[in-house]
Regions:
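Conserved two-lobed SF2 helicase motor
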Residues: 84-87, 179-182, 186-187, 383, ...
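N-terminal pre-P-loop "Q-motif" helix
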Residues: 6-21, 219
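Conserved helicase motor core of SF1/SF2 NTP-dependent helicases
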Residues: 32, 210, 214-290, 297-302, ...
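Helicase P-loop NTPase motor core
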Residues: 26, 30-38, 42, 100, ...
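A basic/glycine-biased coupling hinge at the interface between accessory DNA-binding modules
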Residues: 2-4, 21-24, 29-32, 43-207, ...
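Helicase C-terminal subdomain and adjacent C-terminal extension
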Residues: 606-662
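Short glycine-/polar-rich loops that comprise or flank the Walker A/P-loop
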Residues: 22, 50-54, 80-82, 230-233, ...
């Protein structure tokens, strides 16, 4: 197979792809065709007679590894069973399966996940005679990971934390278990202890590529540089401007380490962007140049300047969400976009609730990434089921979910008897509950539990037409918060988070009923259910995600929400050193460069904090780093606002009408 790389790639891509001997540093800017270059580089190596079994390509997700392998396979048109395209952790696991016995482990070791480790740490605390209540075990687990990976110094010997840590390490080995950190750490130890094994691995993989190199940790870099040390055919591809994972150990300084360790390297920069318009790239370039410790690069495009970047100021976070929802509808009408053309990006998960609920209530299908969907959270699903049984006595499914949630003495045997009775009488579970609540076949305690539950349902039904306090009453009557505290005995923060979610749902319900004249509780439940019913069939959905989750993705239209100081840059970054501010700036850069055609930057004068309190906010200081000439203000006349609201209302009513016909 021969490849004419020069005709398939641009000049810089060609230079990077055609060098296959010796170390190589490829700085690939956002949207610069990095994946295409990597694909053709591997294909070119195969065309030059390099055996596929000698090539190792490492990346960070299974999805990326599979995509890389699939693209190379399509390009060369043959099976590549011996080509190794994998993640760092999968590669490390493979090495341990072959060589872990040299560290005193048995080959039948078990891989522990985070929850396994948390349980093990709890056991160690108890074994040593300490009190579980004195420790936040999840926080302890995070510290242990940082100790193990040498990201922070070990605590002094003799301290309780050091004693628990040492016990945990000893117990892991005694149990013949490893965790995800060990998948990198232990292969390094094997290579250091047994140089002949390192040489065997070096002979096997003579040509190594690392994608997303800026995301590697110091230990991951150490592992790969040890393997590459003999033949020095190591190509690393990355962009220091997109290094946004320091909190999980990524160290963009590895680019500098690579330059020191491989002084004979060749270096290439991919700066031509195939994704975004000129104005979007100008904003990104103007922003990121304020980071001093970076490789000099400037993205450019031949696709023209495109539309100006829109910046919008809102009175509140709720009005920001409604404006974005309305504007998505407007752009779809005017430019024939699909829902899947839109990405809505936020800095933190806490900003998602208002946006997601607004989209759902506005009949905009939404897919949540980088955080859990508000409507998928257990406590929210529970509350919605409580509400559903009040407006629909035929909804057996919802009743089954909450009949003993929280536990009220209605056990599985009782529920099965109610279900059998409903089947025999061809009636609903609700009626079975009413008719059997005094049945002598049940114990007195069971009858009382059934009757008390029925009384609660009747009381709640009386509040359906004035539902402002309905959810508060349900929470109080069922002792729901006590159940949550039982589930999270060690975390007041988790309890507060879940109870705030219920309060937020209550506020959304009240707001919906105030804003939609003559609307009922049933209407609200329908509005939040329509999207859920259609999601499986309708793949065209707006993507709502964190900026971290957006890395590697692109959208025709991007809305950035909550672009305010203490959100981006985060409050923690503002309190700490400039290095943290630089990472926040890189995160904003990543968010901007997800946009292909249009970019909307939004901020609000006030916003609710995590406790639900309204706080005054200021626009992000990063906005001052982008030239005003690139911005246009998205102001609306009252007539335009009214027109948009009427149009959205009509669309909503039409969707409800069609839903009812089904």
């Amino acid at each position: 197979m021969s490849l004419d790389l020069a005709s398939l790639l641009n000049p810089e891509q060609y230079k990077a792809a055609s060098q296959i001997e010796g170390p190589e540093l490829i700085i690939a800017g956002a949207g610069s065709g990095k994946t295409r270059m990597i694909t053709y580089r591997i294909a070119y190596m195969l065309s030059k007679g390099i055996d596929q079994s000698e090539i190792l390509a490492l990346t960070f997700t299974n999805k990326a590894a599979k995509e890389m392998a699939d693209r190379v396979r399509e390009t060369v048109g043959k099976k590549l069973d011996k080509l190794t395209t994998t993640t760092f952790h999968s590669f490390g696991l493979g090495l341990l399966k072959m060589y872990i016995q040299y560290l005193g482990y048995r080959n039948d070791f078990t891989l522990y996940d985070e929850n396994d480790n948390i349980s093990l740490i709890k056991n160690c605390i108890v074994t040593l005679g300490y009190q579980l209540a004195d420790y936040n075990v999840r926080t302890l687990r995070d510290f242990f990971s940082q100790y193990k990976t040498e990201r922070i110094p070990l605590p002094e010997k003799g301290t309780a934390v050091r004693e628990i840590y040492d016990e945990w390490l000893m117990t892991q080995k005694a149990y013949n278990v490893v965790d995800f950190d060990d998948l990198i750490i232990l292969p390094i130890k094997i290579f250091e202890k047994k140089p002949e094994i390192l040489e065997r691995v070096q002979l096997r993989w003579r040509y190594i590529m690392v994608d997303e190199f800026q995301d590697t940790s110091l230990l991951q870099y150490k592992l790969v540089s040890m393997i590459a040390a003999k033949y020095r055919n190591l190509a690393v591809v990355g962009d220091d401007d997109q290094s946004i994972y320091s909190w999980r150990g990524a160290n963009y300084q590895n680019i500098i380490n690579f330059e020191k360790d491989f002084p004979e390297r060749k270096e290439y920069r991919l700066e031509r962007n195939y994704r975004s318009t000129g104005n979007i790239l100008s904003a990104a370039n103007a922003l990121i140049v304020h980071n001093k410790e970076r490789k000099d690069k400037k993205l450019w495009t031949e696709s023209g300047e495109g539309a100006s970047i829109s910046i919008m100021r809102h009175p509140t976070g709720e009005e920001e969400a409604m404006w974005i929802a309305t504007h998505i509808r407007k752009l779809m009408r005017e430019h024939h976009y699909n829902f899947s053309d839109f990405g809505v990006l936020v800095r933190t998960n806490s900003l998602m609730n208002t946006l997601e609920t607004t989209f759902v209530e506005s009949q905009i299908p939404v897919r949540v990434s980088g955080g859990s969907s508000f409507f998928d959270r257990k406590e929210i699903r529970d509350m919605l089921c409580f509400l559903k049984i009040l407006v629909n006595e035929n909804d057996d499914n919802s009743l089954l979910r909450i009949i003993n949630t929280p536990r009220r003495g209605i056990g599985r045997t009782t529920v099965e008897r109610l279900r059998r009775y409903a089947d025999e009488k061809n009636t609903t579970l609700h009626i079975a509950l009413e008719e059997l609540s005094a049945a002598p076949e049940f114990r007195e305690s069971t009858r009382k539990a059934l009757q008390d539950f029925i009384k609660m349902i009747h009381r709640w039904k009386d509040m359906v037409n004035t539902p402002d306090r309905l959810l508060d009453t349900i929470v109080q009557d069922t002792c729901y918060e006590a159940m949550v505290r039982e589930e999270f005995p060690e975390s007041d923060k988790a309890v507060a988070f879940k109870m705030r979610g219920i309060q937020f749902l209550s506020e959304r319900l009240s707001t919906y009923l105030k804003e939609h004249k003559d609307a009922t509780l049933r209407d609200y439940l329908r509005s939040v259910s329509i999207i859920g019913d259609e999601n499986d069939d309708d793949k065209s959905m707006v993507s709502l995600m964190t900026m971290h989750a957006s890395k590697g993705l692109e959208f025709k239209v991007v809305f950035l929400a909550g672009i305010e100081d203490h959100i981006i840059p985060s409050a923690r970054a503002l309190e700490e050193d400039n290095r943290n501010i630089d990472e926040e700036r890189r995160l904003f850069y990543v968010a901007i460069t997800r946009a292909r055609e249009k970019l909307y930057i939004n901020y609000s004068d006030t916003r609710r904090d995590r406790e639900g309190k309204e706080k005054t906010t200021l626009p992000s200081r990063f906005l001052e780093e982008i030239p005003n000439t690139l911005f246009q203000n998205e102001e609306k006349t009252p007539e335009e606002t009214l027109k948009d609201n009427i149009s959205s209302a009509k669309a909503f009513l039409e969707m409800l009408k069609n839903k009812n016909k089904k």
